[in-house]
A protein has these predicted regions:
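N-terminal Rossmann-like NAD(P) cofactor-binding subdomain of oxidoreductases
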Residues: 1-160
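Feature for intrinsically disordered/low-complexity regulatory segments and propeptides
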Residues: 166-170
Length: 173
């Protein structure tokens, strides 16, 4: 996957390796003069001028125009937006929707494997800290919640990727 010479021999590369891979390999390939098609699930290239977000039931005309005009980079869209457009795209096309206001709370999985591992580690530590109380039906739930909150605020949970504990709450962006 990191052998540039092998990759340069390909006409089409379809990758779901994540943003770190894309950020490392894609520019090197393009700088080497590679003219193939790059199809990527990562978010890294979504905002690039020479890339088209693909959601063919909604923007097939944009994809076709891009292919006809030499675009070689195609990327998947944000999962929330893609699902919304799949469900509402036809309504927009028929001019039946005037306005949509959306609020989403992105999942840890959007950050990739390291973020998911950190979240699961946090969850495990939180559970371990109150496992005995949870096993005892007579334990007061407010006492359990206080212990979880205390650990969350203690600075003892891993936060290398998120910067703050995600388990048990939301990141205040």
């Amino acid at each position: 996957a990191y052998d540039l010479e092998a990759l340069k021999a390909l006409d089409i590369i379809v990758t779901c390796q994540g943003g770190d891979y894309t950020n490392e390999i894609y520019p090197k390939l393009r700088e080497s003069g590679w003219q193939g098609y790059w199809i990527d699930a990562a978010s890294s290239l979504r905002m690039k001028d020479d890339a088209i977000i693909i959601l063919d039931p909604v923007n097939q005309d944009v994809i076709t125009d891009g292919l006809n005009n030499g675009v070689k980079t195609f990327v998947g869209g944000n999962c929330t937006v893609s699902l919304m457009l799949m469900s509402l795209g036809g309504l927009f096309a028929q001019d039946l929707v005037e306005w949509v206001s959306v609020a989403t709370y992105q999942a840890a999985s959007g950050g990739g494997a390291r973020h998911m591992r950190e979240l699961l580690t946090q969850m495990g530590q939180l559970h371990h800290s109150v496992a005995d109380e949870l096993a005892n039906p007579a334990s007061a739930i407010l006492d359990i919640e206080r212990k979880v909150t205390q650990l969350t605020r203690s600075g003892e949970l891993p936060v290398d990727n998120f910067g703050v504990p995600l388990a048990g709450g939301l990141i205040p962006w």
